[in-house]
Swiss-Prot record:
The keyword Signal applies. Expressed in venom sac and, to a lesser extent, in venom gland. Not expressed in brain. Its main location: secreted. It is found in: Secreted. It comes from Ampulex compressa (Emerald cockroach wasp). The lineage of its organism: Eukaryota, Metazoa, Ecdysozoa, Arthropoda, Hexapoda. One of its GO terms (cellular component) is extracellular region. This is Ampulexin 3. Monomer.
């Protein structure tokens, strides 16, 4: 069960990281 929680946590961090990178790129264009 713990392995699933860790995997979910890592996936969430990855999604948040890539999302923030996209936001920063959009800001640079403006």
């Amino acid at each position: 069960m713990k392995a699933i929680m860790v995997l979910f946590y890592v996936m969430t961090l990855t999604i948040i990281g890539s999302f923030s990178m996209l936001l920063q790129k959009a800001k640079e264009r403006q």
